[in-house]
């Protein structure tokens, strides 16, 4: 993983202006194709050839408190804009958006540049999708390039990463705030299994959500859980549940696995990949770049939320930073009509992290960290 901590320290002195490897089969894969049809945009550059895959059997168990109806075939009312396919000079973009100018940080073969504003510092490396925002790892859609001694960045990254982070002030609801917490898995869907004693992920995610709920309520949030017991619920129904309750934010809680590899560790936070951008992780599913889902209307807000939560958990736990990531296969995020993220709070396949996750005090620490990230 890209860890340019020393680069960040160098950058701050400039005074600039203004999951992992594949888990056990089916660990977090969608239970079935989403109950809607994604809207195809008009521009279709040829993406990489995606591997063939087979979806697991469909599971569709209704929540006991609400009757679910399928989403309409088309959920995006207006046609989204065509994906950006151009590259732009980062210096010209900085002038146009009144940020600090990009500055080179190193003369080594790994050439990195920093660009900052009053909101923070973004560091990119030429030829790499790895980047950092205020010291927290992230992943670009496309690797920046050097052309005639200038840094060029893909237009999708400028629109979906640079602008939301460097130029836009994060906004969260201040009144009548509703947040839906989604404890991953449940019922016959255990999730991943602890390498220590075989305890299922579903038990730990539910406990995490139960600990988090009163902390958010104390801050004025109305908190609704997609499940409050060991109940099975299809990922598409979790999205429908959130929409039915008019959620302002949606946070799905999970733990990770790289079994049989026991070495992988750390924290990842996901939001859905913007239309027209390749994902950070696909887990073998086709990465259909040019499909548009309801939650893509909140790309900027989801990214900002992901960084708030991710940074807060890192600071509280000292976990390895695996970064804020983008994925398109996460069905629980696709149908959301509000900013939405999925947190992978550690690896149950790693003995050391599994030991922490099984400790109630550590799960309380995770809950406190998520609550601290929200106003």
Regions found by a protein language model. Name each.
Residues 1-8:
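Bacterial N-terminal signal peptides that target proteins for export
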Residues 199-375:
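Active-site-proximal helix/loop segments of hydrolytic enzymes
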Residues 15-18:
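C-terminal motif of bacterial Sec signal peptides marking the signal peptidase cleavage site
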Residues 22-200, 207, 212-215, 219:
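Primary recognition of N-terminal secretory signal peptides and signal-anchoring hydrophobic helices
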